[in-house]
């Protein structure tokens, strides 16, 4: 049975989810029946078709009034500011992909359910009272049929947690620290302008800008054994897309660089195939643009100090990789229902 999807919020993640659905060939498994976005329909169609990061969409795109066609597939366009006014019941929506970045509480999820949706998947971390937080490849098998309000965590959480789990299973992590080197985002300024965070008042293209991150809390939410054992900081850098994560962990088992790289390279071709990739090529951030993996380990940058301190560099396309995981988790939510019946 084809899963009927609605996308609420057609920004960076919403558009990339729709593009990824077609580029991955999964539109027979999932069908987008509606998109709710306050912007004009003409702009929605234009930005879907032409993207500075990811290039021109390979599928034909046509828009007329409040309808969008991708090839022969027709999608209804809505422009409603209140969740309660969305016609999810009439459209028989199975899963709402909540990509607005505005909503993240259980009450917000329940509003979608009251509007008639079967389930809700947030494209960002939500409150502790959600039914589940999923990092695909690590804990999607814990999804139950009764889990109706789910978070897909964050792009950086999806990037680093598979690597942390692999290192912990093999070498027993005691503690860790993470530095996220993240591309500029749309909550920053093109030129100096007001923002509640004084660092984000500054022009994104001219500075490396430290910002707050809840990544350590996100790690603990999915891997609770690491509560109070990880710290994280984040800086935004003046690039358009792709993020690097510097991960340092202290482990109980004495290790060497070769052992760490062997572990991660093997996982990329076996248990974490399609989620984690591994490279030893002399690549830079732009080379990972449009990469669908959650994490790409750069084996040339692995270091071990004193046999017990491991440092790794992990890349991710913070848009495209995460968009693909949104689709994976949507299918996992549907499988949980199917397995229970």
UniProtKB/Swiss-Prot annotation:
Matching PROSITE patterns:
GAPDH
List localization entries: Cytoplasm
A single GO CC term for this protein reads: cytoplasm
- Does this entry carry the keyword tRNA processing? no
Annotated pathway, please?
Cofactor biosynthesis; pyridoxine 5'-phosphate biosynthesis; pyridoxine 5'-phosphate from D-erythrose 4-phosphate: step 1/5
Q: Does the keyword GTP-binding apply?
A: no
Per its record, the protein catalyses: D-erythrose 4-phosphate + NAD(+) + H2O = 4-phospho-D-erythronate + NADH + 2 H(+)
The similarity annotation says:
Belongs to the glyceraldehyde-3-phosphate dehydrogenase family. Epd subfamily.
The name of this protein is D-erythrose-4-phosphate dehydrogenase
Species annotation: Edwardsiella ictaluri (strain 93-146)
Gene name of this polypeptide: epd
